């Protein structure tokens, strides 16, 4: 066991790989995956450990020098046999995503630098998703979508998820919603690839075992023209989470726990690689929550080794060939952190920083004005299922306004169509109505980042809000004096019922 370096009884860290005892993992957890195509994926995947040693250098990297997952992905994308942290390399990009906030600027820079009549490097590798400032009367926000539409038509962009009827999102079959959830649902997230996006939470896609990170408009403009980007290879921190997940915890609790341990600067320009038995037990949506917030710790990217859960999700959404990679047994990590998840409690991040961690039960005297359930972090189908489960178990009505913003059209439909397990066939929407919540809103980023004054559920007053979103900086959801407590859907729902920050164990046993 590694030495304890924190006052927390749940965390151990070792500065060397040998201290961690890699050899203690059972041999049966090794895996063997060859190049994957739809319907031809190995079913022998049982864990997330390094591949067997008889693999060729072409798929495992250097035999003498081990590499991490991120290093292998970047080595392959740069056509090198070996890369090490600190290397500056030109990387071939598999997918570039942009949205209505940054898309016009990225295309503008592309035209300025490459010429008004220049063509993008590959119109089938660019994904354009309106999602931020959508359902608003703000003319400038609406103009951004118009500009993207013009560029996508001109460039024959295949994957432009357009919206034209702002009064009825369901009248727009191409419209999806929040980019990071839509990317996964539409099959753009694939193990072993490089995915870049003009949004800091692009790191969400690392849940699929790929290198995914956010970039600025200037870099995006260059990628539009060349399909390449200059990157510095990041060192990798490893987070090993073991133990049975308590029924009252969610991935949001795990990532808030981690950020609280290492701080918002603790992973600056580093990869955060997650593994362990707890990670293996998580669904894809929960893994997405985990990777979504690595940037709140300063991380360059987050990554989870792909396993059967990953491949089952991906193969049902794409026919594009992909090749998973895994960290070598002799790969170098700059730090190892180990958590016993079975001993963790529900947590929140108090204003005004994601690392201002506290136990939910320690904040029981904090009165709140509203609850917000939504965003790329906490607006997925399983997030709403969790909130509905708690509401149903409690059998009570909310004491504060509770706003629900599904991330995508698919999530919105799931809220109205899928029965909540153990609720007698009731859907989320039915349970939310019985609990007195607001009607689920049109899918978008909504009030997560404030937005125009008429944005649904925006904090226009200095109120206290419990939110399933990812940031709680001053002004993040609107009013500069607003106070945001970041929490899991369970904790958010419990807080809605009590009118204060609440521990979900009050309602979940």
Swiss-Prot record:
Localization annotation: Plastid, Chloroplast stroma
Location of the region described as Disordered in the Swiss-Prot/TrEMBL record: 1-25
Entry's EC annotation: 4.2.1.33, 4.2.1.170
Any one GO CC term of the record: plastid
Enzyme class: lyase
Transit peptide segment: 1-47
Tissue expression as described in the entry: Expressed in roots, leaves, stems and flowers. Expressed at low levels in siliques.
GO molecular function: 2-(omega-methylthio)alkylmalate dehydratase activity; 3-isopropylmalate dehydratase activity; 4 iron, 4 sulfur cluster binding; intramolecular hydroxytransferase activity; metal ion binding
Cofactor note: Binds 1 [4Fe-4S] cluster per subunit.
Note: The environment dependent reduction in IIL1 activity and severely impaired growth of cv. Bur-0 are caused by a triplet repeat expansion in the third intron of the gene.
Function: Catalyzes the isomerization between 2-isopropylmalate and 3-isopropylmalate, via the formation of 2-isopropylmaleate. Functions in both the biosynthesis of leucine and in the methionine chain elongation pathway of aliphatic glucosinolate formation.
Family: Belongs to the aconitase/IPM isomerase family.
Descriptive protein name: 3-isopropylmalate dehydratase large subunit, chloroplastic
